[in-house]
């Protein structure tokens, strides 16, 4: 599987059986810039973090930088 990874937003190979994931959350600039986004690549299982929205997927390059409206 290939997953996008920030900061370069490049696609990299991940080990077999891993999932791609994207993290979004609000920081101190959320009201100005919108949610912060990290394309963290891949993990063996979908991680969970309190206060962070994590979306996981399991196909090549399925975690592109999300499009969203600016505040």
From Swiss-Prot:
Alphabetized UniProt keyword annotations: Acetylcholine receptor inhibiting toxin, Disulfide bond, Ion channel impairing toxin, Neurotoxin, Postsynaptic neurotoxin, Secreted, Toxin
Entry comment describing in which tissues the protein is expressed: Expressed by the venom gland.
DNA repair found in the keyword field: no
InterPro entries: Snake_3FTx, Snake_toxin-like_sf, Snake_toxin_con_site, Toxin_cobra-type
Disulfide bond annotation, renumbered to this chain: 3-20, 14-42, 26-30, 46-56, 57-62
Locations listed in the record: Secreted
Principal localisation: secreted
Keyword Disulfide bond: yes
Gene3D superfamilies assigned to the protein according to its UniProt record, in alphabetical order: CD59 (2.10.60.10)
Protein function: Nicotinic acetylcholine receptor antagonist. Binds to muscle nicotinic acetylcholine receptor (nAChR) and inhibits acetylcholine from binding to the receptor, thereby impairing neuromuscular transmission. Produces peripheral paralysis by blocking neuromuscular transmission at the postsynaptic site. Induces concentration-dependent inhibition of indirect twitches and abolishes contractile responses of tissues to exogenous acetylcholine and carbachol, in the chick biventer cervicis nerve-muscle preparation at 100-300 nM (in vitro).
Misc: Constitutes approximately 3% of the whole venom protein content.
Family: Belongs to the three-finger toxin family. Long-chain subfamily. Type II alpha-neurotoxin sub-subfamily.
Descriptive protein name: Alpha-elapitoxin-Nn3a
Organismal lineage: Eukaryota, Metazoa, Chordata, Craniata, Vertebrata
């Amino acid at each position: 599987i290939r997953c996008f990874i920030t900061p370069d937003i490049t696609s990299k190979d991940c080990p077999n059986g891993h999932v791609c994931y994207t993290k979004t959350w609000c920081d101190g600039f959320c009201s100005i810039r919108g949610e912060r986004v990290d394309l963290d690549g891949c993990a063996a299982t979908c991680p969970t973090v309190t206060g962070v929205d994590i979306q996981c997927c399991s196909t090549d390059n399925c975690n592109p930088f999300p499009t969203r409206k600016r505040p």
